[in-house]
């Protein structure tokens, strides 16, 4: 019994041990299985993570590649547009000098390590893929990078363009995006734009909808402009709460330079985005000062308010403020911003001119031509004159370079066939014509008012949306001309050259096609744009409006250079500075004083022309009618101060006055064959002739109908025989 109990006890212990062992091993097997499953699961998750990371990396690299490709395309288009502007070395030098920033040393944060040279910034903000070389890094630039802190911008002048876009609701997205691309290019060239949106389109839409709905439509179009600029790679921002409207009786409204009471109330809301390289876009909406009620206003009032703000003409200060404090405050405002351009993008284009073949003023010297342009616009509605077409028909021909083997008859022969020209908008209703004239008059008045309070260096450009959107795209090939040449963008060309795309003193026939169906090279097609400056007055002695320039009559006193109206010392300085030669004044006076036809002076003797009546050799100077008929109108001196050469349009102003007001029937002159200005003369003359056995080239502007063989021979004889009056006598050798 004892043995049985012992065996039973041992059996239970063994069984328990076996059960425990089995349980233990079972747990081990379960844990091993779980480990295998967990390892497999972890391995699968890692693969998925790696795949996702690889996919994300590929997408990122692809995105970067596409971004670089897009940036290169933008930069290529940008550089081609700049190169297509055809700026000369002098114009490029002037652009760099005018847009040179102040030399400032902004304070550095304490934690910042001293950096001697920063080669990671892009010169002149020309693109993120181009690292600045030493030449680029040291070149003058003022465009501020959006990422640069405000402390680094405090010392630089912001160069600003004020842009008004009229009727954007009539423009498709492609054109609007093109305008945004152009404004982006201007920003990269250093001219950051403030855009004002004008939804007036000549219809009565704003009268058919509520005031609230009209304001919403204006904001919608402003948002389209913001989107178009953003799409070009330059950031824009809608700013709709900076324009205030003064109530009746307020101090602001009483100020004459704040006409209409429209003014800027929150300057920093404008300046903050400008400092960061962001383009503010303003709808033509203002808020009353007292109640902050939103009101739609005219875009021209907004533009003038911004012009006054950027020019430093702010609302009046407190009467208790010290004058010196006010003066310093105004100087600080003017040193912060330079409003260099006023750009009006209008579907109607530039200011019409009834007496020009192309139909538009190319250049307006507002000081001299504003009233004349206004009266012409009111009288004709801007329609082209058929009478002017016939009188300038000969200007269509190319410039002739006469040689000895070409007979005179080859260029005096009249062309057969009359030009047929249809005036622009001749079939429009009187209401439409009145609307066009209203918009043109508003643009003309806006340009004049803005330029009147801006520095003389500021200018204005009025052009069409299509021209503003032109980014130098390739044109389809035309068999009749070189159809693949790039067309200039007038905004970029104007920024780099401070000139219109075409000179205003060119003969009208060379400014564009004679007929709308005539094939013409795109690079020579005239854009319907008008360039304007405040300019300078032009004084003409004697005034051809009251005393037409005619050959001298025996016994009748003639004007002389010693006349009290003429400042002879300043005239002599003008001639000597322009020609870089000393004039033998007494010898010159003896030669010209009895032959002077008239004198043209631009501004404060910045440019001028002296014209005489010359007798061909062999013709007796007896005062007879026959002698007077043989007298030749001769341009004796054409001079522009060196500091005014190549800019400001001084030469064009003088030349245009000469051929338009003084000698519309033609004038001749000569120039040394190696004179670098001959190209300029050649473009403005009707014909040229290299005089045999001399170092002279003859030019003249005489129309074909006024030219005959005797006149041509008289021109040639006079240009060969006139003796120079320089003090060094070197001109005699020519």
Curated annotation (Swiss-Prot):
GO biological process: L-arginine biosynthetic process; ornithine biosynthetic process
Designated name of the protein: Amino-acid acetyltransferase, mitochondrial
Record field: catalytic activity: L-glutamate + acetyl-CoA = N-acetyl-L-glutamate + CoA + H(+)
UniProt region (Disordered), positions on chain: 384-433
Organism this protein belongs to: Botryotinia fuckeliana (strain B05.10)
Keyword Repeat assigned: no
Keywords: Acyltransferase, Amino-acid biosynthesis, Mitochondrion, Transferase, Transit peptide
Record carries keyword Oxidoreductase: no
GO MF assignments: L-glutamate N-acetyltransferase activity
Pfam families found in the cross-reference section: NAT
Gene3D superfamilies hit by this protein: 3.40.630.30, Acetylglutamate kinase-like (3.40.1160.10)
Function description: N-acetylglutamate synthase involved in arginine biosynthesis.
Organism taxonomic ancestry: Eukaryota, Fungi, Dikarya, Ascomycota, Pezizomycotina
EC number(s) on file: 2.3.1.1
Localization in the cell: Mitochondrion
Domain N-acetyltransferase, chain residue ranges per copy: 555-724
InterPro entries xref list: AceGlu_kinase-like_sf, GlcNAc_Synth_fun, Vertebrate-like_GNAT_dom
Compositional bias per record (Basic and acidic residues), positions renumbered to this chain: 392-406, 415-427
Entry GO terms, CC: mitochondrial matrix
Pathway involvement of the protein, from the record: Amino-acid biosynthesis; L-arginine biosynthesis; N(2)-acetyl-L-ornithine from L-glutamate: step 1/4
Homology family: Belongs to the acetyltransferase family.
